[in-house]
């Protein structure tokens, strides 16, 4: 069951506007997975390079075809719109913001509860700001896109507020990974080591901001563990919905933590994957890696013995085992997290790919 399916089953209109990238075959589009409507792209943003590439070879492979912006509604086949090239790349985030605002207004006018999901396509490569923002910061295209995104998110907030829905709307801003790990990327991960496609904190830590006036305390900052999969049971709790009892749900209900009823997160641990590779686990402020990543490329290093980081002592992950010999007891809870996860995979392997 998806988040959109759970919300739809509980009376919410559901719309996605932006990048899907979770399947682009019949039965796997967002409107097959709980969303009522969708406008966006089905694959990754880098495909915008292809139509403008002098070396692109048409017919080289059945899957090596240009991406199109797509639109679909539940119960209908998606339709292809314009080619997703560099020109469209620069304007698509404006378009999906407008689609989302229109969706919100339509549902508000009907007094219908809604779930609007906007997976923006920026700042993945190619980083192409809208013409309205190109050159506005004086600090290059990446900074222009940050300013652009700030404005677009502000428009969404303003829409909610002007419709009188502020107190009744949960607004979340977050990301799915740290900066893109390519030399041309100008993303920034602060003091954290690594980038996307690495097992380090620069990949795992992302911003998470949530607004729900009167329910979630304002101006509160926390360093507690929180995983995006926690949103499923947490949002279900917020709306009083039941979650399935016939399968393992990896997320934990964080409603008490977010609403200030508990200072501690309900999550004690998480597992670290890159693709299908299990790299390690985190438990409280401790981290154990059984594999590491070559930071000059994407080579995987299998460790003869796991590396252990105390992230309170070594937040930059510079010195494995720093002060670790005094605390080898932590091996037991760290290994237990990994064993529990492996048990859950064996006992509930999930839905097979079609």
Feature locations, PLM:
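Formylglycine-dependent sulfatase
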Residues: 1-306, 311, 315-354
């Amino acid at each position: 069951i998806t988040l959109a399916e759970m919300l739809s089953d509980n009376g919410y209109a559901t719309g996605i506007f932006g990048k899907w990238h979770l399947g682009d075959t019949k039965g796997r589009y967002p409107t097959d997975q709980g969303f009522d409507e969708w406008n966006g792209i089905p694959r990754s943003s880098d495909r915008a390079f292809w139509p403008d590439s002098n070396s692109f070879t048409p017919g080289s492979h059945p899957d090596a075809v240009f991406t199109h912006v797509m639109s679909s509604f539940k119960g209908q086949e998606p339709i292809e719109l314009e080619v997703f090239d560099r020109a469209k790349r620069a304007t698509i985030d404006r378009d999906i913001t407008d689609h989302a605002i229109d969706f919100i207004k339509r549902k508000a006018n009907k007094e219908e509860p809604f779930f609007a999901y906007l997976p923006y396509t920026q700042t993945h490569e190619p980083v192409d700001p809208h013409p309205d923002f190109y050159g506005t910061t004086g600090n290059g295209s990446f900074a222009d896109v940050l300013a652009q995104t700030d404005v677009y998110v502000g428009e969404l907030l303003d829409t909610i507020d002007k419709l009188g829905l502020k107190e009744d709307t949960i607004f979340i801003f977050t990301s799915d990974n740290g900066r893109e790990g390519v030399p041309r990327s100008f993303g920034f991960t602060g003091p954290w080591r690594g980038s996307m496609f690495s097992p380090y904190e620069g990949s795992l830590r992302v911003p998470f901001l949530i607004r729900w006036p009167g329910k979630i305390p304002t101006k509160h900052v926390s360093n507690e563990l929180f995983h995006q999969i926690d949103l499923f049971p947490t949002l279900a709790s917020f709306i009083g919905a039941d979650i399935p009892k016939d399968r393992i749900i990896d997320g934990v209900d964080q409603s008490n933590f977010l609403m200030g009823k508990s200072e501690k997160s309900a999550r004690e641990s998480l597992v670290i994957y890159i693709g299908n590779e299990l790299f390690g686990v985190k438990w409280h402020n401790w981290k154990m890696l059984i594999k590491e990543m070559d930071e000059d490329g994407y080579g995987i290093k299998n460790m003869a013995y796991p590396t252990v980081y105390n992230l309170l002592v070594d937040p930059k992950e510079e010195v494995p085992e720093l002060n670790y010999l005094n605390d080898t007891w932590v091996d037991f809870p760290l290994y237990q997290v990994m064993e529990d996860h492996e048990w859950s995979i064996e006992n509930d392997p999930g839905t097979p790919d079609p």
